A protein has these predicted regions:
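Short alpha-helix boundary/capping motifs
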Residues: 133-137, 291-292, 316-317
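Short, glycine/charge-rich flexible loops or terminal/linker lids adjacent to PRPP-binding catalytic cores
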Residues: 293-343
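Glycine-rich phosphate-binding loops at beta-strand->alpha-helix junctions
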Residues: 275-284
């Protein structure tokens, strides 16, 4: 999946950018990146975070980077943000995307003229670089972003950092979210709305499907109005999203309670306890327990200090290992009992 966070401030933005980006660590464990713009132009840092958390890897960078605007990301695959120099000028870009027609887009760009892409290990093309190439096909950034949203088969939500501000664009069907927060002297742009709560921001707006906004120190301006065709990914509520998040005004935690309650109404089993598999299964189990009246218990404990979410690695054997090692059973709560176990709905 992946997630991102951006800041436009009248003051230095690094504190908010660092912690806001870190609050997206549940969405990816592959790479993290920060890009900022200030008096000295653009600066960027990208690190592998597979074996060390985002905060540890970027603590030194944050002390050295300076700027009043910036974007950061947690990526589950390609390195980003990228800094791109084109006829639009220089900009930094980060994306949350799933592009199904990469080969067709690449060939179309090749057919239109001289172009090249840098291959990542394994021969894959960086999807964020491909999005930048699509944007650069048009005469201005707004038309370029619209063209990218329309051309991609799959999903694309992005942030683009320029010397003037941050352009934010939501997937044309709203599959993935993008939210703007506000506080005195600053705006933020984020995938997860809870990411700005502890930083002092309050809700400003949630972009609609295909909406493009530009955020500057002076305010937020809508450049392309939202469409009406909403097809948001429901797995955000069921699994990907953090419990304290909300999408389209619907709380993740409350949605999981309701899903568990619906299961309880459907079932006719009578277990001794209801249990959830951490992390997302816990709230489903709580909802089931509340509705059924059957006690909730925690016979499966996740070892949170070191084990990440098991869906992140691309190698199945690694996913199997993490899934096995991260959960520790409490045998005293399991032995001789009938269980109703919720993994996720």
């Amino acid at each position: 999946m992946g997630g991102f966070f951006g800041v436009v401030s009248k003051d230095d933005c690094l504190f908010d950018l660092f912690f806001g980006t870190d609050y997206h660590s549940h969405l990816g464990t592959r790479r993290g990146g920060l890009a900022v713009y200030g008096e000295n132009g653009f600066d960027r840092s990208i690190h592998n975070i597979e074996n060390s958390p985002f905060r540890t890897k970027f603590d030194k960078d944050v002390q050295e980077m300076k700027g009043n605007m910036g974007i950061g990301c947690i990526s589950d695959y390609e390195p980003q943000p990228l800094i791109v120099r084109s006829h639009h000028g220089t900009y930094a870009i980060t994306t949350v995307s799933k592009i199904n027609n990469i080969d067709e887009i690449v060939q179309d760009i090749f057919d239109k003229g001289h172009a090249h892409f840098l291959e990542m290990s394994g021969g894959d093309i960086n999807a964020t670089e491909l999005v930048a190439a699509l944007i650069n096909q048009k005469e201005n950034l707004i038309d370029g972003i619209r063209y990218a949203l329309e051309t991609i088969d799959g999903s694309l939500t992005l942030m683009l950092l320029t010397p003037k501000g941050i352009y934010a664009a939501r997937d044309k069907y709203g599959r993935t979210p993008i939210v703007i927060g506000q506080k005195e002297n600053a705006y933020c742009v984020t995938f997860e709305d809870f990411a700005y709560r502890n930083l002092g921001y309050h809700d400003y707006k949630e972009l609609g499907p295909g909406e493009i906004d530009v955020i500057t120190t002076e305010g937020v301006k809508t450049l392309v109005a939202p469409g009406k065709d909403m097809k948001i990914c429901t797995f955000l509520w069921v699994y990907y999203g953090y419990p304290s998040s909300s999408y389209e005004g619907v709380s993740v935690e409350e949605m999981r309670y309701r899903c568990g309650a619906c299961l309880a109404k459907r079932d006719n089993v009578k277990p001794d306890i209801v249990a959830g598999v951490p992390d997302s299964g816990i709230a489903h189990a709580v909802g089931y327990s509340n509705e059924s009246g059957i006690p909730f218990s925690r016979p499966f404990i996740k070892y949170t200090p070191t084990w990440p979410r098991s869906f992140m690695p691309t190698i199945q054997s690694q996913r199997n290992l993490i899934a096995k090692m991260k959960l520790i059973a409490v045998h005293e709560l399991i032995k001789d009992k009938k269980h109703k176990v919720e993994e996720k709905v």
